[in-house]
Amino acid sequence: MKDIDCYKIKKINIPGVAEFYDVIAKTLNGRELKPMYIGACNVPCLCPYCYSKLKSVPDLDYVPNKRRKDFYYTSDGFCIVSQKFKDFCDEGRYGNLDFQKLNTSDFYFFEPHEIFKTNIHWIPFNEFKIWCNACKNYAELTGGVLKDESFKLETNDFIMRTDNFYGKYENKHPMIVVGLETERKMKDFGLKGIDFDNVYG
């Protein structure tokens, strides 16, 4: 974290995260696929009060409508990856990763188990709406990813997921975070369809 001039933050009232923090990792974003579930009421593991997705439970009978890239998100927030993406993770010996093969293709639902702790309260870098006392989450959380100051990274080569789910209601999902060295390796491996966005800390 860079030295922060608190007076300057107060004066402009719009803190710029890139001005006060360093880029320490990247999130993975991809092209959009059709929804895995038709209708919000059919998405599993929603809070019954605010309808936020609390856990990603894939339908393994899902058929991707695009198959030319290595990394996708469905429009309802499920990460779908290719066999090549899985090969990259296997060859790199990245641990604590969940790959569930889809029944009709050589694609997988993908989610890391290792948690990247985030700070969601840097406004306006993040926007959050509708706090739910039942599930202890915001029904809407949008914006970028900022590392929590208490969370220490021990390596620059990792694949994790955020502790918070980003997005709105049933479409929320954890963001996948990789180290800067991992980003380089993914590019060298030739993985297609991945957009890398900055993670600050």
Where are the predicted features?
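Phosphate/anion-contacting hairpin/loop surfaces
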Residues: 1-201
